[in-house]
Amino acid sequence: MEKLAAGLAGLRWSMGAFPLDLIVSRCRLPTLACLGPGEYAEGVSERDILLIHSCRQWTTVTAHTLEEGHYVIGPKIDIPLQYPGKFKLLEQARDVREPVRYFSSVEEVASVFPDRIFVMEAITFSVKVVSGEFSEDSEVYNFTLHAGDELTLMGQAEILCAKTTKERSRFTTLLRKLGRAGALAGVGGGGPASAGAAGGTGGGGARPVKGKMPCLICMNHRTNESLSLPFQCQGRFSTRSPLELQMQEGEHTVRAIIERVRLPVNVLVPSRPPRNPYDLHPVREGHCYKLVSIISKTVVLGLALRREGPAPLHFLLLTDTPRFALPQGLLAGDPRVERLVRDSASYCRERFDPDEYSTAVREAPAELAEDCASPRRARLCLPAPRAPGLARAPGPLAPAPAGEGDQEYVSPDWAAAPEPAAPPAEIPYEELWAHQGPEGLVRPPPGLDLISFGAAGPPRREPEAPPPPVPPKSEAVKEECRLLNAPPVPPRGGNGSGRLSSSPPVPPRFPKLQPVHSPSSSLSYYSSGLQDGAGSRSGSGSPSPDTYSLYCYPCTWGDCKVGESSSRPAPGPLPSTTQPSQASRALTEPLSGRAASLLGADTPVKTYHSCPPLFKPSHPQKRFAPFGALNPFSGPAYPSGPSAALSSGPRTTSGPVATSGPAYSPGPASPGQAYSAAPPSSCAPSSSSSSEWQEPVLEPFDPFELGQGSSPEPELLRSQEPRAVGTPGPGPRLSPLGPSKAFEPEGLVLHQVPTPLSPAALQGPEAGGALFLTQGRLEGPPASPRDGATGFGVRDASSWQPPADLSALSLEEVSRSLRFIGLSEDVVSFFARERIDGSIFVQLSEDILADDFHLTKLQVKKIMQFIKGWRPKI
């Protein structure tokens, strides 16, 4: 120590004094310094030689000691976030004023209307919102709430939504799964069958109506979006967060309490805490404290080198930070001075633990509450644009020019242009987020800050990133928000912009337009989303505890890991408000490796997503499909043919006679169109007519099938092998849509009857098309035994046999099938009213038949056995 003291006594000091933040940013730490002439620092004399150890970020919780039965408030202390002792939560005063309440629906929440609620379980809800009272356009509005989400209630509104008068769960789910939701509303066509679809036996299909649904307007602080929660939304809510309720039992560290409980909160020291030799306030067992707020500050650790040993101390980087002189040999790069610095550092390393010093409990100084109530003021101070001799980088520091020493050193965010009136001592929290648009923001010329020593230019307007897009809301919500005229809600997820600077971010200063008060004067770490990531701020603007680091800021000691000073990756390009000039940035490239961000990296910019539709078909569909929005047989697996071009035509068949809706003809139909069927030997003359229709006709399954020999092939196989009209093959054939040809099979006579057109629905792969045929009367000789099933004639319904594959049945054939298995006419008429064809029929379950259709057990058993292949032996 004697040798070290002799070396220190022989040091010669620079003539000028430098700001502490400039020394920290430009000098290799640790370094030696002493107070400049005329400067004062508490606990430091003019003769003391200081070892500037490191620059650190301290995050502490401000607490009041509670005495005399919680009524007398004692001194205010700072408890570091890394304090190892544990605390137990006491019964809070707010629990007496506002007892914990639980809700099971949004309607219950609206009836009480507390200031804020917390979601106790994940909730997903969906509602169909109509754009207007006289508009058919609608959009599905769905949202998801996560457990622990904090919602601030803002008001109530009503939205127009599409409701259904009555709806059955299982049958509705089946129709939606098949894409046949239109059948629910009775929009299958214009015929009389759909007119009575809403009033059938056993609860017919539901008809959509527009209704006003009351909603609760909330702000979700996790996503920073407003929500409209319908009253009918069910879920568990509470006035306390689930994490806070879990914290009522057990003992917890300060960090755990801050992350999960809304401040202020009263705590008790349940057991004897560990001792720290640097503690300036003893925390004893049984003491009670009120945790008030969280604050973050930048401090410079130092040691006064004295004969009795190093005395640790720290300086807050405020506007009145004292100036220090540096050894002249250090500025000139004298190796003897550098060796003296290394010896001093090794001497202090054995006698000083910076980590323990950083976690000590101290009494909060009174001036800190006044001068540094907001952590945005506790930051690295940037020098004003003076001292042109410092524009050299990274060479030795030059003293300030004479004659300018009387200028007060202030932070450059408001010191570049002198103002007649002093700025307010505190920036309101809402003001930080109001009026952030590019208009009206004229940035003063950049000063000589820690990194860039560039030339100052004229005032210029800095381009700023546009604000994030507004999340999608209904018109009613927008109108309600306009009526509420609520104060601006600051985003709690972070500042949203990346900064890479050696000093904490400084918000732009704006003239205060009107006093705007925060809805809560005590925003906590939990309620403000500090736990969401790096760079996030508490209600008072303090950084996340995750960005707190015990490692020094630009420290280059051997045991200090600079890379751990911030665990976040370097952000992208700088925002224009902190971007240094290109020339000055090039000068400071060697120093950029030592400068780490004190407040962590940026928070990712929030993007908004509108609600996607519930189901998007992979193939194009007509907007107003008559029988449901989707056709189960018209997917990409089925090749397109003539039926694909006809699939959008309206089709309604209910019963033996069907009437068409709009007069729609899918092709150049002539009055002579008819179904024609003949033995294979008689089909050759009609093959020449295929030139009238350029595309091959897919083989349909004749709804009036005449025999066992003409049962259809599977739909997929048949649709993949189209045959031209007139090709020999089993089953009936459809004549081309064109002018009438001379077609005279043996003994078959067609008598034209002037009756209106009626659609004959194509079945199987051609579902959805409609052919309009003239009503005629076919007469022919009785089918001979050798003709078998190929003879064409009108057979009575009693001889009709259902096919093996029921999925291709038409509405009429479903009715025939029900009569075939002996069901009553009221069941048959109910199935006809519900417009159940084969594709729906084969997917009916026992639950749907019994619960939704209210059929008897015998009827349910018959239908289920029939679907599975049972046929009555008649």
Swiss-Prot record:
Q: What is this protein called?
A: GRB2-associated and regulator of MAPK protein 2
Positions with biased composition (Low complexity): 388-403, 518-545, 632-650, 658-691
Pfam assignment, any one: CABIT
What Gene Ontology terms for biological process does this UniProt record contain? Answer: cognition; neuron projection extension; response to stress; social behavior
Q: Which residues carry this modification: Phosphoserine?
A: S735
Q: What is the lineage of its organism?
A: Eukaryota, Metazoa, Chordata, Craniata, Vertebrata
Q: Where is the composition biased (Gly residues)?
A: 188-206
Supply the InterPro entries for this chain: CABIT_dom (IPR025946), GAREM (IPR052281), SAM/pointed_sf (IPR013761)
